[in-house]
UniProtKB/Swiss-Prot annotation:
Binding site for ATP: I18, G60, V61, G62, K63, T64, E65, D263, E329, R401
NCBIfam families: hslU, PRK05201.1
Stated name of the protein: ATP-dependent protease ATPase subunit HslU
Family (UniProt): Belongs to the ClpX chaperone family. HslU subfamily.
Chief localization: cytoplasm
Keywords: ATP-binding, Chaperone, Cytoplasm, Nucleotide-binding
Length: 448
């Protein structure tokens, strides 16, 4: 769990996301409150539940990116799901409980990777010893006797010196291309189960039943020392991981620090006064989500998981519906409402130039691999931002994603030819490539 203050969290988010300060403040406070809760003594600690967040704003303004970056900052188990993929229990589709099961799978994977990383040094030492055993096979033990005692001591010293010499050569990479034959763990038998929609849980359980078949078997393989070293490190690191401790740690991490991001929550609202079959199903999804958000216990193949302290962040554009169209019980479980604003021309300019991995830097790095030096002038950046904003206003507003389309169209010719040399992108160049398309609404709908 991160110990960053809300100000530090917002500063980190500013490196990747432009604007949306209200949303950043809300998620920063929510994340800091997770840490604050851990400092409170029991029994009050268990009574403090996270305040779930509802983000409201058009597509492409940073809702998903804020949640994704937040999970990276916190190092917490994180999963993003689409509300439209789930259906009411009894209908064909995924059950909402699979959200928590998938979150546990993510936590198990992350916890295992962290445990392997912690044990890597010990695993490297063990792998090194196994390779040295192959390069320097131990001589058969001679029966100890009166005449054999002294030579055995000398041989032992010689073997130790030779082993140290080989160890030094191995670390210097002098044996990397040498082929050796060694015994490694045989890969476990894989069973892929193709399940019909709505039967994913059954398929997962069936796959788990057959997963252990063939585990522990050995096979002899011939490979280069460099490849063998990598494989043996993974094998030895896996041996050092305690599976029971790993499961317990992962489940605790999910319960205390898990974050679930539910996108497109507006698509499961009931619209209007009439209630069609689809509307009934949508309301059913909301009712099924209620226990998860409120706090319940979900059964997973690794154990029971309580959702009382998992943070839920829901988001939606709410263009055809309103947050008040959600069922009242679910509205009450999402107490923090944050509205994200549409992007302005200045926001588009900042997205193109100010973030750590802005689009202009990405294209410059890509084309630099073939000797093309892209230079973006201020006038070119200004025109790109204006055109992206203009097309969003005239057609569908897809937010910052419009910049991908605009940039691809702008640099299509340069990327295709990829001739070494300098290429200057100024206002005139942008107008020459995109001006006519942007002005004509009929063309912009199909091209940009």
């Amino acid at each position: 769990m991160t110990q960053m203050t809300p100000q530090e969290i917002v500063h980190e988010l500013d490196q990747h996301i432009i604007g949306q300060h209200k949303a950043k403040r809300a998620v920063a406070i929510a994340l800091r409150n997770r840490w604050r809760r851990q400092q409170v003594a029991e029994p009050l600690r268990s009574e403090i539940t996270p305040k779930n967040i509802l983000m409201i704003g058009p597509t492409g303004v940073g809702k998903t990116e804020i949640a994704r970056r937040l999970a990276k900052l916190s190092g917490a188990p994180f999963i993003k799901v689409e509300a439209t993929k789930f259906t009411e229990v009894g209908y064909v589709g995924r059950d909402v409980d699979t959200i928590i099961r998938d979150l546990v799978d993510v936590a198990i994977k992350d916890t295992r990777e962290a445990a392997i990383k912690r044990n890597r040094t010990r695993a490297e030492d063990a792998a090194e010893e196994r390779i040295l055993d192959v390069l320097l096979p131990q001589p058969r033990k001679q029966p100890s006797g009166f005449f054999a005692e002294e030579p055995a001591v000398e041989e032992k010293h010689e073997d130790g010196a030779t082993r140290q010499k080989f160890r030094k050569m191995l670390r210097e990479g002098k044996f990397d291309d040498k082929e050796i034959e060694l015994e490694i763990a045989a890969p476990a038998a894989q069973m892929n189960v193709m399940a019909p929609p709505g039967m994913e849980d059954f398929a997962s359980q069936l796959q788990g039943m057959f997963q252990g078949l063939g585990a522990g078997k050995k096979q002899t393989a011939k490979m280069k020392v460099a490849d063998a070293f990598k494989q043996l490190i993974d094998e030895e690191a896996a041996k050092l991981v305690n599976e029971e401790e790993l499961k317990a740690e992962a489940l605790k991490n999910v319960e205390q620090n898990g974050i679930v991001f539910i996108d497109e929550i507006d698509k499961v609202t009931s619209r209007g006064e009439g209630h069609s079959g689809a509307d009934v199903s949508r309301a059913g999804v909301q009712r099924d989500l209620l226990p998860l958000v409120e706090g319940t216990t979900v059964s997973t193949k690794y154990g029971m998981v309580k959702t009382d302290h998992i943070l839920f962040i829901a988001s939606g554009a709410f263009q055809l519906s309103k947050p008040s169209d959600l069922i009242p019980e679910l509205q009450g479980r999402l107490p923090i409402r944050v509205e994200l604003s549409s992007l302005s021309v200045d926001d588009f300019k900042a997205i193109l130039t100010s973030t750590n991995a802005c689009l202009t830097r990405q294209y410059q790095a890509l084309l630099a691999t073939e000797g093309v030096e892209l230079a973006f002038e201020d006038s070119g950046i200004q025109r790109l931002a204006e055109i992206a904003w203009q097309v969003n206003e005239k057609t569908e507003n897809i937010g910052a994603r419009r910049l991908y389309t605009v940039m691809e169209k702008l640099l299509e010719e340069v990327a295709f030819d990829a001739k070494s040399g300098a290429c200057r992108i100024d206002g005139a160049y942008v107008d020459g490539k995109l001006g006519e398309v942007a002005e004509r609404e009929d063309l912009a709908r199909y091209v940009l």
